[in-house]
Amino acid sequence: NTDVSLRVEEMENTDSFKVSGRGELHLSVLIENMRREGYEFAVSKAEVLYHTDENGKKLEPIETAYIDVPDEFTGVVIEKLGQRKGELRNMGVSNGGYTRLEFSIPSRGLIGYRGEFMTDTKGNGIINTSFDGYEPYKGDIQYRKQGSLIAFETGESVTYGLYSAQERGTLFIGPGEKVYSGMVIGQNGKTDDIELNVCKTKHLTNTRSSSADEALRLTPPKILSLEQALDFIDTDELLEVTPKTLRIRKKILDSRMRKRSMMK
């Protein structure tokens, strides 16, 4: 490793490594480089490095976020950063119909936020951050308000199964793709995870309806980039990276074991 700002530690499980870097962009560049070199691996959601004080109290890194945003998007930015434990420290008028915001926010509150910020501001917002120091832990953050659509069976996705599934949310796959139990195939429109069978075919009958021959229309799937996939995955999910594909999966693939772990 020639990158002095990158630290790699072997975990107790010899199949996994803990990789520490300078932020999401730094780690995503490493992932993309490894992918291009032919590696296949899985990554978890990025985490910050915590410290403890002399009394054993948990401390976390805090950053100052400087934001310039068109006036009409000020409300949504303040709301989203508030949900991520951000505290508005300053607010003023900037040039050309822009508002300048200054937030104090935990570093983990910014994980996965920049893509969301660009969407919320229609690409017109500017965000810069600087490290402030370590402060007492601010409490849990809910990174995602929408749950996942999870494949229930292993097989190949078919139009009929996907047609039923797309009513539940946004799909990440189209027909003819290999799926396996525990694989995330889309984003739910609601907060909870839903298991779906996208491999199911329509039962054949002797009767025909007037619309029997009409092709089922599927909404084109949302194809996630590496950055979008890293932003999307939740703490109980992994991103599988191969030279040709990106797949999101639950850490625990078995449905029963997954539900059992959630009850603990």
Q: Which residue stretches match the model-derived regions?
A:
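Accessory interaction regions appended to the cores of large information-processing enzymes
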Residues: N1-K264
